Amino acid sequence: CSSDLEDYDHLVDLGHTAQGDHVIMNKYVYDADVAVLIGHTQGNPYGGYSGGYKHCATGISHWRSISAHHVPQVMHRQDFVPVSTNSEMRHKFDQQGMRMEEKMGKKFFCCDAVLDTKSRQIEIHSGWAREMQPVSWKTADKRTYVHWAEKKYDIIVFGMPTNFHYGNGMGTNPIQMMQALSAQVIRHRRIMSDHCVFIVSSICDGYFHDERWPYLREL
């Protein structure tokens, strides 16, 4: 989140969504003549694709709003799978973003770049977040899932990088490593045999990047 969550002079309480989520947002954005969200559309290990209403639901909201979706009762649901556009978590992003639009009296103008495996821009979409999201997902879906493959495989060899997504140390932290692998299982499930095995190449040197995640060793 990019807001100071204790600076209540610069936060606006927008009440609750129809689903009961408390929405509090950044007052600078609320008061702006034009509200612009700039980011990317890329498959996340959780919560579906990045971009769209996910920007505002996590980036300019309050911890009370974030606690409606980044919690076990949402992230441990059966519909909680990586790179999904239809889950409770994704729906909460949309609901909170639309609540912000309703109370601001204006729509978010969203500009998202669809990224490839090396985070290069392969397509850019701009417009109202509600209409732009599904358009960007079409190309992101082609990049993320292996639509062209037909054969099923017994073995998948995967190189686990040390530095990805949130920062250095993710590929050597066992919790985040398992999360990254689960995302690959979802991506490739269609071409995996019933007894498929992942062979993962990783440094496995115990590096947790304690400066960034001081709590993960205990966790």
Across the structure, where does each feature detected by a protein language model lie?
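C-terminal catalytic subdomain
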Residues: G169-G171, I175-L219
